[in-house]
Each structure stands twice: as C-alpha cells, then as structure tokens.
C-alpha cells in the first residue's frame, strides 16, 4: 500500500475517536523487552497527538515472579491470581509502582507525551476489599477446603475523578494495579480486571488488551484460526462451550464485562508485534480480535 493510502485509511478512525478515551492495558507478557515497551509508549503518544485520550493500565506478572525467585520465594497462583503474603506485597509494590510504572512514564515522556504515574491508592482511585478465600473440593473425599489468597483484592469502586482531571488537562495517566481498602491496607489486583473496570468507570470508548497471543483463536494451537470480530453473545457461547480457556479466560471475561458495562469495543491483540496498537486502531482489518455488543 502506498504510504499516503495508510494515512487516508486512518482518517475515519481519527475522526471517530477524536477526544474519546482509549484504555490500553500493557500486559506483562507483552512487555518482553525494553524495545517493545518503548515502541508501545511511542504509539500511545501518537494516539494522544492525533486527538484521542489514552489511559494506560500496566501489568508485570512475569517480572514480579522473577523478583520473587531472586529473593528465594516461589510464586504461587490460584486461578490466575497470585497468592500474596505481606512480603510478596512489598515485592509487588516495588516492581509495579517502583519499577514498571516509572519506566513506562519516562518512556511516554521521552516521546513527547505528558504521562503521570498513579496507583489505585492515589485519591482512592481503586477502592477494593480482600477477596474471599478460594474454595476447593477434594475429588476423592468430597471435602471442601478454603485457600486464603492473602492480600489480593477485588474492586469495590472506581473513582474516575482523578483520571478525568488528568485527561482533561492533556496528561496520559499510567495506572499500577494496586488497590486500597477502607482501612488503608494495600491489596494486589489483577491488571486485566483493573483495566476493564477503569475503562467502564471513565466511559472509555475502547479497551485494548496487549498480550502475547494473536487474539482469541478458535483452535488455541493454530494461530491461523484467529477470530477477527465477534459479538459478546457469540463469545459468551465460546466460553460456555470451553473453546476459550486457560490464560485467555480472565481476559475474555474482562472484555465481555467491559462491553456489558458500556465500553463500545474491546480488543485483544499481540503486543509483541511492533505497532500492533496502531494497526488495530487505524486499519480496517485490524490485527487481533475485536469484541463488540
Ligand atoms: C497480579 C498483578 C500484575 C498483573 C500479579 O501479582 O501478578 C494478582 O495476581 P499481568 O502482567 O497483567 O499478568 N495480581 C492478584 O496482573 O500483571
């Protein structure tokens, strides 16, 4: 395609999303190296300069696990959620708020954006409560057993005020998935859930989840079976029939919930592909899976 045609193809999208909030979730698995993070930060700045209002939520699961291993702690997950004791919570804060958040903020600023780093504690952005213990049933004895996840939270409410104030003043908010409870305790939150809930809370037009797979696949072992567009109802059927499973399940449920809460479209795309964000937003074909009502 001629370079100029790329710009012409982008125009309807630039018009449609002018001044609209776009929630972008930078997944820990998508941020494979500094170059990938830098490229995504630059694309985020481009979105801002063509008139959209990007808001970033980042993860960092793999990096937290690496830090835990270095400190001699073994990471443990139950249904995708990290079991978080006091010491793990300190590591989570250090990695997410101290390292990843500041790194994304400085990369966005380097490319000319005005990024501000926040966690869910700032201005009570993410009020959370400790999750109830996970109940498992022993297959043999049928006995019920409770497993406490520790300092893991579920979101009670999102206060969009601080985010709106920042986007209204041309800043790009960058949010760490850490919540606060009513007694000021820190809680570890799943970053996908945070992205979905904040997207709904701020009335975002789009939720874009950057991860390490091409999107939702009909056959998870075959990248050629990518589903490019799907409605929430069709997707809910795929979930019920067990076609969407494993690591894709929480992301898929987050997208379904976001659409049901009023976000116009949700996208799952491969963040390892350079400029996947721009290809998804500005081209007709897109690059990943787009979910709509
Ligand atoms: C996550 C927070 C980071 C995250 C964790 O501790 O790994 C819980 O599991 P990704 O890269 O998006 O997976 N929190 C409760 O979600 O990062």
Swiss-Prot record:
Origin superkingdom:
Archaea
A Pfam family this protein belongs to? AA_kinase
Which residues does the annotation list for site: Transition state stabilizer? 25, 251
* Cellular location(s): Cytoplasm
Enzyme Commission number(s) from the entry: 2.7.2.8
What residues does substrate bind to? 60-61, 82, 188
GO BP terms: namely: arginine biosynthetic process via ornithine; L-arginine biosynthetic process
Q: Does the keyword rRNA processing apply?
A: no
Give the principal location in a single coarse category: cytoplasm
Which Gene3D superfamilies does this entry report, sorted A to Z?
Answer: Acetylglutamate kinase-like (3.40.1160.10)
Role: Catalyzes the ATP-dependent phosphorylation of N-acetyl-L-glutamate.
What's the protein here called? Answer: Acetylglutamate kinase
Species for this entry: Methanothermobacter thermautotrophicus (strain ATCC 29096 / DSM 1053 / JCM 10044 / NBRC 100330 / Delta H) (Methanobacterium thermoautotrophicum)
């Amino acid at each position: 395609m001629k370079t100029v045609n790329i710009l012409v193809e982008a125009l309807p999208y630039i018009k449609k999303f002018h001044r609209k909030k776009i929630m972008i979730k930078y997944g820990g698995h998508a941020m494979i190296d500094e170059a990938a993070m830098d490229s995504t930060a630059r694309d985020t700045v481009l979105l801002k300069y063509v008139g959209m209002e990007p808001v970033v939520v980042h993860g960092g699961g793999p990096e937290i696990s690496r830090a835990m291993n270095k400190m001699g702690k073994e990471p443990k997950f139950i249904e995708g959620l990290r079991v978080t004791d006091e010491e793990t919570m300190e590591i989570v804060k250090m990695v997410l708020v101290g390292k990843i958040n500041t790194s994304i903020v400085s990369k966005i600023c380097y490319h000319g954006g005005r990024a501000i780093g926040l966690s869910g504690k700032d201005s009570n952005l993410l009020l959370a409560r400790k999750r109830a213990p996970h109940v498992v049933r022993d297959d043999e004895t049928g006995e019920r057993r409770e497993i406490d996840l520790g300092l893991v939270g579920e979101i009670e409410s999102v206060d969009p005020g601080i985010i709106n104030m920042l986007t209204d003043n041309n800043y790009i908010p960058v949010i760490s998935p850490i919540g606060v409870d009513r007694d000021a305790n820190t809680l570890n939150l799943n970053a996908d859930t945070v992205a979905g809930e904040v997207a709904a809370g701020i009335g975002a037009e789009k939720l874009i989840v950057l991860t390490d797979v091409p999107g939702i696949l009909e056959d998870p072992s075959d990248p050629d079976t990518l589903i490019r567009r799907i409605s929430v109802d069709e997707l809910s059927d795929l979930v019920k029939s067990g076609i969407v499973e494993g690591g894709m399940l929480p992301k898929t449920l987050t997208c379904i919930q976001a659409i049901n809460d009023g976000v116009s479209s949700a996208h799952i795309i491969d963040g390892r592909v350079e400029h996947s964000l721009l290809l998804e937003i500005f081209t007709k074909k897109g690059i990943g899976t787009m979910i709509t009502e």
